[in-house]
Amino acid sequence: MAVGKNKRLSKGKKGLKKRTVDPFTRKDEYLVKAPTTFQVRDVGKTLVNRTTGLKNANDYLKGRVFEVSLADLQKDEAHSFRKVKLRVDEVQGKNCLTNFHGLDFTSDKLRSLVRKWQTLIEANVTVKTTDDYLVRLFAIAFTKRRPNQIKKTTYAQSSQIRAIRKKMTEIIQRQASSCTLTQLTKLVPEVIGREIEKSTQGIYPLQNVHIRKVKLLKSPKFDLGALLALHGEASTDDKGQKVEREFKEKVLESV
């Protein structure tokens, strides 16, 4: 029998000398700040690896997208089915300054709206705001019973659907093209839907009219001054205030 060192016995000891390092010791916390258009500014915290050498933490933070419930941002449970996307555009100290990046409905809300015996009408419009943001808005609406209607179903004819869709497109185009992205985020939750509902009463009564989705297609060249103004540097008095713009029907003086 040959006498020598058993190599297999020494291999297992090498792994015992390794010291495990907690990866969170190399990370820093940054605060995520929402624009002043929302009542609640503090969205939450995010983690990122600490700046080391040529790897800058700010570069990893810029471009991050956070999804937040609009009910939490506006302190209103009526908006609990709306989700707002916020994108980090700039990092100031330990604060991540965000801008509006999109809006969507929760899947359970969308599924609860779709029912039998009614017609679903959808429309989408691509429009440019006054501050050169290219956005696409998706609208959704459902027919409802007329007053004193006995018939169970509320199906609209194809011509009525086309007329309603045309009206929806015109209203969205007019509202979105005449305001900034900040103003649009205030109009989207309720104002545009109410105006569409009132404008289409003569064609077919509608219910559950909403802008279900806002998609940001293209942003203008980054402007730090505009972003800082959006986060409290401007001297506007409408910070975090709800928009209550009522739709006024046109009255014909002569027939």
Swiss-Prot record:
GO terms for cellular component: cytosolic small ribosomal subunit. It is found in: Cytoplasm. Keywords: Acetylation, Cytoplasm, Ribonucleoprotein, Ribosomal protein. One of its GO terms (molecular function) is structural constituent of ribosome. The modification N-acetylalanine is found at residue 2. PROSITE patterns: RIBOSOMAL_S3AE. The keyword Metal-binding does not apply. InterPro entries: Ribosomal_eS1, Ribosomal_eS1_CS, Ribosomal_eS1_euk. Component of the small ribosomal subunit. Mature ribosomes consist of a small (40S) and a large (60S) subunit. The 40S subunit contains about 33 different proteins and 1 molecule of RNA (18S). The 60S subunit contains about 49 different proteins and 3 molecules of RNA (25S, 5.8S and 5S). This is Small ribosomal subunit protein eS1. The gene is RPS1.
